[in-house]
Amino acid sequence: MGIHSSAENVALENVRQSVTYHPSVWGDYFLTPASNHEESSTSEGEELQESRQEVEKLLGATHDDSLQKLELIDAIQRLGVDHHFQKEIEKSLQDIYLRCCNDKDDYDHNQTDLHTVALRFRLLRQQGYNISSETFNKFTDRNGKFEESLADDVRGMLSLYEAAHCGVQGEKILDEALVFSSSNLKSILAKNHMSNSGLTARIEEAFDTPIRKCLTNFGARKFMSMYEEDESHSEALLKFARLDFNFSQKLHQKEISDLTRWWKELDFKTKLPFARDRMVECYCWTLGIHPEPQYNLARNFLSKVIMLASVIDDIYDVRGTLDELQLFTDAIQRWDISAMEQLPPYMRVCYEALLNVYAEVEELERIDGPYRVHYAKEEMKKLARAYLEESQWLYKKYIPTFKEYMSVAIPSSGYIMVAGNCLVGLGNSLVMKDFDWVSCEPLMVKASAIIARLMDDMAGHGFEKKISAVECYTNENGASEKEAFEELEKQVSNAWKDMNQEFLHPTAVSMTVLTRVLNAARVIHLLYKDGDSYTNSKTYIKELIEAVLIQPVKI
């Protein structure tokens, strides 16, 4: 059972916390778009379309049963332009998978190159095809260990490392593949004997962010440089990727300009100065979840929701007294403008903004179904209840058991709420079944929330003035901080495996829905892999935002 850090019958403290966050690093920078997307869209759009057709011809001319086709598909995906060729890629990978299934023994026998086998495995798993991990058995000895002679195959080692991140629970050979490839790649980097600088960069990038955890639209710019170093790269594809990046960047500049204006008009900087001012970071969060250009409504809505959820989180963590937080939670459960009267002034401005954001999108979503926004509201209500319970623990000085903590901390991570809200604005391809699926908190959604919660807790340990998974685990198990981190990292790894499992056919919902949840987990990896880069946004995230939203690439 949980414990109190002082006397069991300690009186509730009803005071505000004290935390100071640094101001926005962007201010009004994005208020005026750097370029006019509408004016430049016609001529640039024509050039983009012509370039796209060249890549489409290249895809069609490259034989499916070839390493060249696999590498071309991989490059298209890593350059962030795969949404232009979804049908072509799906057809090619489906043909490859069927060939694997229908002629398994002969096909495996003919494929003896580790790079080819590992790349094919990863591409098929990423597409949802449940290709067997036994395909790697041919590279092991009689004891089931990978042949040491493979260590000199640098490209093969890198492909094996990336493939291992597509594993599910119980795939021992992929666990061994990860250890084996990681060890050998680290040795290769330490020796620094490679003449191929592009391959060195790929290894370093893989250790920082494996492809399975990478947001392609954020990693595309860096990959362009690595891809250009590859002697076999396609100039047509590289040109198209650059044109598409710049074209999309102008659209994103317009979107963040609109959001900056909305945020400035709310004037939370003055009215709620205690809250984190992270509008640009919230937009990039959403851009990671919805990279496809057609989802502008979804990006606009979700950006506002995440920004307001961040403010609400700060109200519960650093501003509200316990009595005020109870009133605020009750008001959110009622979801009625009249409930605003019972709130203190600083809560009213946030509450009104929250209701307005949902009311606006509800009007826009009326054609596709008002039930969509209803589901989204319910997830926000759940989030508020979880925030309140955590606040009650803090005021009582109560440290729950790890299991009890996670039962509340998973919903309070905000990621079940994000999963429910990110489906709003995706168009009529989604149906009520998709929203029902999220509301039931399936394994994939829960795994995404576990990744969010535990990575957030590890990143914020020692800084955030609230109970965390680290504290709960050490108190319950008498463990050291190092042991707690090792356990939590193991749970994060297992959560990724659960997400991989849910991504395999047959799936409960469409790949469109599953990809939103997967992308959401990828955002967390980006933001929290080296500390809390959302709260402390003066870090590498600032440079990344500059690269994605400000600086065009040279054609």
UniProtKB/Swiss-Prot annotation:
Which BP terms from GO are recorded? Answer: beta-caryophyllene biosynthetic process; diterpenoid biosynthetic process; farnesyl diphosphate catabolic process
This entry's Enzyme Commission designation comes to 4.2.3.-
| Cofactor binding note of this UniProt entry | Binds 3 Mg(2+) ions per subunit.
Respond yes or no to whether keyword Iron is given for this record: no
Query: Which residues does the record give as Mg(2+) 1 binding sites?
Result: D313, D317
CDD domains, A to Z: Terpene_cyclase_plant_C1
Molecular function (GO) terms for this protein are: magnesium ion binding; sesquiterpene synthase activity
Quote the InterPro entries the UniProt record gives: Isoprenoid_synthase_dom_sf, Terpene_cyclase-like_1_C, Terpene_cyclase_plant_C1, Terpene_synth_N, Terpene_synth_N_sf, Terpene_synthase-like, Terpene_synthase_metal-bd, Terpenoid_cyclase/PrenylTrfase
Using the record for this protein, list the coiled-coil segments as residue ranges, or answer none.
Answer: none
Q: Where is the motif DDXXD motif annotated in this sequence?
A: 313-317
Reaction(s) this enzyme catalyzes, per UniProt: (2E,6E)-farnesyl diphosphate = (+)-(E)-beta-caryophyllene + diphosphate
Per the record, the domain of life is: Eukaryota
Q: Which UniProt keywords apply?
A: Lyase, Magnesium, Metal-binding
Q: Where does Mg(2+) 2 bind?
A: D313, D317
Q: In which pathway does it act?
A: Secondary metabolite biosynthesis; terpenoid biosynthesis
Q: Which cofactor does it need?
A: Mg(2+)
**Binding-site residues for Mg(2+) 3, renumbered to this chain:** D456, E464
Q: What does the record give as the function of this protein?
A: Sesquiterpene synthase converting farnesyl diphosphate to beta-caryophyllene as the major product.
Entry remark concerning the domains of this protein: The Asp-Asp-Xaa-Xaa-Asp/Glu (DDXXD/E) motif is important for the catalytic activity, presumably through binding to Mg(2+).
Protein family (similarity comment): Belongs to the terpene synthase family.
- Supply the name of the protein: Beta-caryophyllene synthase
Name the source organism: Phyla dulcis
